[in-house]
A protein has these predicted regions:
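C-terminal substrate-binding subdomain of Rossmann-fold SDR/epimerase-dehydratase oxidoreductases
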Residues: 16-184
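Conserved beta-strand scaffold in the Rossmann-like NAD(H)/NADP(H)-binding core
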Residues: 5-7
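A glycine-centered loop/beta-turn motif at secondary-structure junctions
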Residues: 1-3
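Conserved catalytic-site region of short-chain dehydrogenase/reductase
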Residues: 11-15
C-alpha cells in the first residue's frame, strides 16, 4: 500500500470560503475600496485578534507539493532509495493578521504612507486619514485562539524539490484583486 501523509499549513486563495479570516479581510477591503471610490459611507472591517501569527501559502503551490508527495516513489527510488514518506508544506514564515490587513488595504489603494494604527489589542483601529477602515471587535475573538502557527517544509524542499512560488504579498494582492473584480 502506497501511503503518504501531508501536513498542509494555512493555504489560501481566491476560492477560500468567506468564513475564513483571510477571505473576510479581502472581501471587506474590496467592498470598502468600492464604496470609498464612490464617496459612499462605509462600515469598517471588524476583526478579532489581529496579533496572531499564521504561516500562509497559496493553495495553488500546495497542489504542486501534494502531486510531488504522491509521486515521490519514483523520484525517491532513483535518488535516495527511501520509501515514500510524510512531508510538511508551508511558507516557513509567519505574518500577523494585522500585516494581512495592511497589505490588503495597501493593494486596494489605501497606501501605508497615509494609513495609521491607533491603539493596541482590543482597542486597535486602522485609519486612512480620518476614515476608519478596520477595528478590533472583541466579539470576534475565538475562545481557543492559537497565537502562532508556523511550519517547517525543509524536508519537502530538499527531498521533493518543492518550494512555494507565491510569496505573502503576492498572495494577499491576488486575493484582493479577485474580490475587487467580483464587484465590477
Amino acid at each position: 500500500l502506497y501511503a503518504v501523509q501531508g501536513w498542509l499549513f494555512n493555504h489560501e486563495g481566491t476560492r477560500r470560503g468567506v468564513e475564513f479570516v483571510t477571505r473576510k479581510i479581502t472581501q471587506n477591503v474590496a467592498r470598502i475600496a468600492d464604496e470609498f471610490a464612490r464617496k459612499e459611507n462605509f462600515e469598517p472591517l471588524r476583526l478579532g485578534n489581529i496579533d496572531s501569527k499564521r504561516d500562509w501559502s497559496d493553495a495553488e503551490d500546495f497542489v504542486d507539493g501534494v502531486w510531488k508527495m504522491l509521486n515521490q516513489e519514483e523520484h525517491l527510488t532513483y535518488i535516495t532509495r527511501k520509501k515514500p514518506d510524510d512531508y510538511v508544506l508551508s511558507s516557513d514564515e509567519t505574518h500577523t493578521i494585522k500585516e494581512f490587513v495592511e497589505e490588503a488595504f495597501n493593494f486596494a489603494g489605501f497606501h501605508r504612507s497615509i494609513c495609521r494604527w491607533e491603539g493596541h489589542g482590543e482597542e486597535a483601529k486602522y485609519y486612512h486619514g480620518d476614515d476608519l477602515l478596520m477595528e478590533v471587535d472583541p466579539k470576534f475573538y475565538r475562545p481557543a485562539e492559537v497565537d502562532l502557527l508556523w511550519g517547517d517544509s525543509e524536508r519537502a524542499r530538499k527531498e521533493l524539490g518543492w518550494k512555494p512560488k507565491t510569496n505573502f504579498i503576492q498572495l494577499v494582492n491576488k486575493m484582493v484583486k479577485h474580490d475587487m473584480e467580483l464587484l465590477t
